[in-house]
Amino acid sequence: MQSFRERCGFHGKQQNYQQTSQETSRLENYRQPSQAGLSCDRQRLLAKDYYNPQPYPSYEGGAGTPSGTAAAVAADKYHRGSKALPTQQGLQGRPAFPGYGVQDSSPYPGRYAGEESLQAWGAPQPPPPQPQPLPAGVAKYDENLMKKTAVPPSRQYAEQGAQVPFRTHSLHVQQPPPPQQPLAYPKLQRQKLQNDIASPLPFPQGTHFPQHSQSFPTSSTYSSSVQGGGQGAHSYKSCTAPTAQPHDRPLTASSSLAPGQRVQNLHAYQSGRLSYDQQQQQQQQQQQQQQALQSRHHAQETLHYQNLAKYQHYGQQGQGYCQPDAAVRTPEQYYQTFSPSSSHSPARSVGRSPSYSSTPSPLMPNLENFPYSQQPLSTGAFPAGITDHSHFMPLLNPSPTDATSSVDTQAGNCKPLQKDKLPENLLSDLSLQSLTALTSQVENISNTVQQLLLSKAAVPQKKGVKNLVSRTPEQHKSQHCSPEGSGYSAEPAGTPLSEPPSSTPQSTHAEPQEADYLSGSEDPLERSFLYCNQARGSPARVNSNSKAKPESVSTCSVTSPDDMSTKSDDSFQSLHGSLPLDSFSKFVAGERDCPRLLLSALAQEDLASEILGLQEAIGEKADKAWAEAPSLVKDSSKPPFSLENHSACLDSVAKSAWPRPGEPEALPDSLQLDKGGNAKDFSPGLFEDPSVAFATPDPKKTTGPLSFGTKPTLGVPAPDPTTAAFDCFPDTTAASSADSANPFAWPEENLGDACPRWGLHPGELTKGLEQGGKASDGISKGDTHEASACLGFQEEDPPGEKVASLPGDFKQEEVGGVKEEAGGLLQCPEVAKADRWLEDSRHCCSTADFGDLPLLPPTSRKEDLEAEEEYSSLCELLGSPEQRPGMQDPLSPKAPLICTKEEVEEVLDSKAGWGSPCHLSGESVILLGPTVGTESKVQSWFESSLSHMKPGEEGPDGERAPGDSTTSDASLAQKPNKPAVPEAPIAKKEPVPRGKSLRSRRVHRGLPEAEDSPCRAPVLPKDLLLPESCTGPPQGQMEGAGAPGRGASEGLPRMCTRSLTALSEPRTPGPPGLTTTPAPPDKLGGKQRAAFKSGKRVGKPSPKAASSPSNPAALPVASDSSPMGSKTKETDSPSTPGKDQRSMILRSRTKTQEIFHSKRRRPSEGRLPNCRATKKLLDNSHLPATFKVSSSPQKEGRVSQRARVPKPGAGSKLSDRPLHALKRKSAFMAPVPTKKRNLVLRSRSSSSSNASGNGGDGKEERPEGSPTLFKRMSSPKKAKPTKGNGEPATKLPPPETPDACLKLASRAAFQGAMKTKVLPPRKGRGLKLEAIVQKITSPSLKKFACKAPGASPGNPLSPSLSDKDRGLKGAGGSPVGVEEGLVNVGTGQKLPTSGADPLCRNPTNRSLKGKLMNSKKLSSTDCFKTEAFTSPEALQPGGTALAPKKRSRKGRAGAHGLSKGPLEKRPYLGPALLLTPRDRASGTQGASEDNSGGGGKKPKMEELGLASQPPEGRPCQPQTRAQKQPGHTNYSSYSKRKRLTRGRAKNTTSSPCKGRAKRRRQQQVLPLDPAEPEIRLKYISSCKRLRSDSRTPAFSPFVRVEKRDAFTTICTVVNSPGDAPKPHRKPSSSASSSSSSSSFSLDAAGASLATLPGGSILQPRPSLPLSSTMHLGPVVSKALSTSCLVCCLCQNPANFKDLGDLCGPYYPEHCLPKKKPKLKEKVRPEGTCEEASLPLERTLKGPECAAAATAGKPPRPDGPADPAKQGPLRTSARGLSRRLQSCYCCDGREDGGEEAAPADKGRKHECSKEAPAEPGGEAQEHWVHEACAVWTGGVYLVAGKLFGLQEAMKVAVDMMCSSCQEAGATIGCCHKGCLHTYHYPCASDAGCIFIEENFSLKCPKHKRLP
């Protein structure tokens, strides 16, 4: 065994090393704790039977278990020592690499399996020890595996591909074994093998999981159990703890459950992919050196398999015996299994940290094992392990899925499609199998779609891509193709999927969670797969046509023969997972030294996408590819390796996914230019699609297909789906397939053409810093893609950026010789990678989507939504929705420009998009990609694909135009389809996914825009960059937030403009691309615009001018926008370039409406007039562009919002029509305010429509239809979560835009100005709850609805324009910019408002608002605005009663603090502020903004900083009062209206008192309602106190300590007022405290406790613990990534094991972060924390409320901190349920909200102390898992305050865990004299008994003792 291990050790080491490196990264990513040791541990565990021994604790320990075993260490050392060595040796020499695989199998199986008691391993062990006779060994092993097919098939693989098995291509490994299992497994998979596997195969899987971990045999065994990587992944998921607990632990530990999600993605995805990549590389080298060796078994097939899927057992796959069978079922099954599994535990887990964590024990281990297997693949070359890490969780499934999908898909899909037709070589070709898998997936999605995709995608793409891409990419990829050909083929097929997961990993927590979670279901996975297929098909159309067009496949199928592609994908993801961040950074740094390697790796990773195309090409060119692959692979083996490392790092951060595509972009610069182009094309497509796929996986398979459909549809539309990612490549792809059939020429052409985005942007903008980030993005189409995907997944955005950076670097190098860009971009990539890694890590805990990706977000769309919400909070935690979080975070660090813009944009996107998922959702991850949007997108894309496939096939330009048309159609169709599909998505209630999708789609749309005209292409990249990088913070904010998908698509030009202007300040550089870009968009959009906006324009120039200055003031984007607007407008409307710019800004809304109208028309016109449709799309784009240009921040945001709103779904048509901003807004606001948004949307949409109609002809046109739609959709929207539709269109979109602007530019610059109005509804969750609460408790709203229902119906549609305008302004604050601008034009008074409105958006908005409100709007507009706002809010109760409600809402608007006049402004400000907060809160703020959108006043209220969140619920209460504008003003004062009216921004205290008094009078019933009072309290902090005092304090559960002894404490838990006379707080005793905490948490922990006020508060005080207190504070870093966050007690990330989310952040009383200012600004600058929390406090305790947020009564601090952080958001919705305030508002805050449930530690929210990801309060941030806190002695949660945490942390530092031997144990055995201490997770793993009566623990030794 030792000799075998040594033998294998070399390989095993390589694998292990790779795992060490990769898995270290993975583990690090997965579980944030140091992962080097961990990966080592993993390797050790793998290398040794350490795994079996239960190295899990070690793994859990983090890097802790390095010394787990001497042998393990030795193996580790061997691996590590051989890290470079094995990588080089094993990689180069790798003579035993086949053996390595076998050895790996054997080492893992042998030593590990032996320990794992894998009997099967015994047999495999000997074979693995025969690395030399690998063929024989493999055969034996295979036989053994086959014999043990049920469980050891992985062994088969291990034997066959012992090397392959180790590859962590569980997929692939599983695939050869699947031959036996294929039939059974297919059923299993059909049955969601995950479950079957979980129950029947868990142990085998678990048992083999170690094998899997140790070698792919484990995977194979797992596969045999699971019958494929998917099964492996499923096994992971299915085999929860029981399966392979030892493994489980290591895997889990390795996977780091919280990061595990992402890690799962990374792990799952990368394990297969990364390992595969590494294996590919290793195999490449090994092939080089050991081709003969590998040939032993199947000289070439083994080579191919080992190269392509060495760890995929493709060596044996060469036999094809397994593949056909396994492939037929396995790919699907694998995917399905993976899907279910994904969806079940890993993905869901990824989607939401806990999911994976909770189900993941085995899953995790499996994932870990899988990555372990995988790691060897990417062994020494680069720490792919870490990179793999990224993909472990979500991607583990995808990875194996990809692998299996590749292999099995090839067998399965190929079987149906190619297998029969393809030669055995082809069959053995992993790429082919990948294609087959994809085909299978596609078939699963729908044979029709598949046929369409195949036929349509193959034909056009086949032409250009086939010849050029196929060969060139294949040759280049062949360098990296060997592995790809072998294992990566499957993985590539899966790679696209994997890459999507990779993308998802980026947004893994948002999106991957979506992806995996979504993948969890067959549909999602199939969709994902289809997505991959389509991604391939889209670029090469061949993906679907995989067998039809091998070359096309090569080009399109990144997973195809081009190992590079495969590898790129695999590397991308595996690198991502396996490469540690630092490692990757180093790699990046090193890569800078050897950009070639980076390029190679990047190209490879890009090729991963390209391989999608190549995969198909592989069908035809499989032999060629195979022939080429070995040598090529050898050639690029090392570079890919390094690159994979590089990529891995990126991917691991969820940047890797993008970077991979991006990297290949860089690579294409050199050898892989073609590949880069191709890969980028596909990779971006993949990534973009991943956003969609993962965003949409849950929504439906259709989503994936649709995504793909769009892509395939558009050769350019293909890019449409991946607009951003495909930005260049879609064009390039389209160009490649239609334009230029030269892959090489194409990449360069792309670099030049797509690089018009690249080169143009790189050339022009390349120099710009933004260029660095953005041009890099633009440069790297993949990056753009990533932007798209990232837009889809916030997380992905950074990857996109990174990729863009890398590719940008190389491309720029190529294009502009921008070595600076190379260095800068590389640096950016490094930073981005590191950041992305961070992001990924952060997202690990999360996307989406985090997750996401969110990606982002990643349950189904629902999950996405959940994820989005979760992501919203998570993203808040992460600093973006899901995704948006990691992405934003990484972006922020990534590059100053990118960081600022992209981060902000991402924050916006994440929060708006993800927040809306998610956010992923993006991506989302998104995380994470918008699920709803995705689904709708997918369907729309699909539809557009079907419709536009032909147009897309036209030609480069034709394709582009059709692409634009398609994009437009896809966008529009998506929007129209969204109405069709989105209804389902909406039904799925995935506003966030929608947002993600929107973002993605926006990006797509923008891409088609760009694609529409080659000139545009440059813009598009910029746009993509913008969305991705948010080139200009303004643009990023508005566009990123508003138009990641939509903004990107429709805002692309404007994004570009912005980007160009922002990046290369003048549009002059931008003009080439921008002018041309805007020209077509403007031409297209201009025509429509002229039609829609000509009138508007005329009226709007001055408003626009105001807006423009405002916008510029607000953000550079405005300036950029202006020039861009000029360009766009010029093209659009030759009449007034400058004017038009401004006009555009104002018109943005009109444009949005135009877009809406355009959409409306477009659905009818459809692709009828491609030009026209394109124009419309362009119009959409242009509108966004104009939006972007004119009201860059606002409009773009609006456009984005509108775009999002359409994406949202049911209201998609309405959404489509109302405004892109609306759509976008919907996404933005999707999380919570969807309903509110629906109401607001309705009222605003109506207002917006009316205003629109009023504003201009086009506007009128649109509004006419729109209002009807709105009206129609109003109630649907109302019912559905498309609140953002109308509301964003009206108010939110602009606010969102402004918010974006504010958030980006204003956040820093405007925050001072906006401080007064910055209302940070921090958490999407809170908003959601708020929306729900408000809906539930909105008597006044209902009253108002009843009061003014008569006029309501007519008003929305055609109320008096003035009223409508006002309503629009008030209700449609966001459209106000455009619509209000129109209205302003229409209404003299509004014109100033319009001007002020833009200003409002700007930091100066407030003053402008005040002025305008006071001057014109205050009187009539004010009333009307209030009315409008009332209407939106009233709309909530009655969607139809817009006018009456508006009127009744007048008061409400006032009550909401949305002054009638200022309402519009306020909406800007409020929404902007809210948006800013929302951006921060990512999804939560989206909810808040939704609230804001729901009532412009609400944001105002929020601005006021009290709890203006419940405008819908509570504003309703005050609405009676609200009707009285004066009184309302009082109420509004705290809201914002009063502030504006009276000029008091923060004088809400006195005002609230009045308002409160009024409210009391008017809402006498409400006071009786605890929730209602809470709301009131929230509204008025000062008055709240009075109120609280006046009223009997609300009862809070408490624990009375009867008696305290040394050992026992008698406590009485008082849960009801009658239970105990005196309310005691928690006792000191831990049990008591826990109990108390539980109790009080269970009750209205937040609300009741705080309301225990008066006596209660005072009484408990004596019993309050004397220990240090921590307050729940705001999440200081919006980029907080779950991956970065670890529990301060157990040091594990969120969702680690079953720990659930992390609660927090808790800050020491003395250092509550001052970042609240944003929150405070959002809430109220004056006492934001205090005031915001005061309302909450008030809700909780009036008196305590008085206490400062920090110094507030102990119970109150949580409230203040929480409210401070999410004051407005929580205050309003949470006001009702304060407990929600912390939990839901906060990401996973257990404390206030969760605390209600935390007591049940059923939720076991894990909060963890955030690793200070961001400077500032982060160092003081403490995140804790609920269970850890509850079970840790001396830690109590009292009234939201966490007592004793610091002490417990100090004590824990010295406590060694008896289980994992790591420091930090916090729970000790309660048995007298027992010294065993554990981490909570370790204790649960160790079998300790938790006694909930007293929260004590008994170790296994004493658990049976009395």
From Swiss-Prot:
Gene3D superfamilies: Zinc/RING finger domain, C3HC4 (zinc finger)
Disordered: annotated span: 1-261, 273-299, 335-370, 469-520, 538-571, 656-712, 937-1299, 1344-1570, 1613-1637, 1746-1775, 1794-1819
Stretches annotated zinc finger (C2HC pre-PHD-type): 1780-1835
Residue intervals of every PHD-type zinc finger in the record: 1855-1903
InterPro entries: EPHD, Trans_Reg/Chrom_Remod, Znf_PHD, Znf_RING/FYVE/PHD
Biased composition (Low complexity): 66-75, 213-226, 278-291, 339-353, 1101-1119, 1242-1252, 1628-1637
Primary localization class, coarse: cytoplasm
GO molecular function: zinc ion binding
Biased composition (Basic and acidic residues): 950-962, 1798-1812
Protein name, entry field: Retinoic acid-induced protein 1
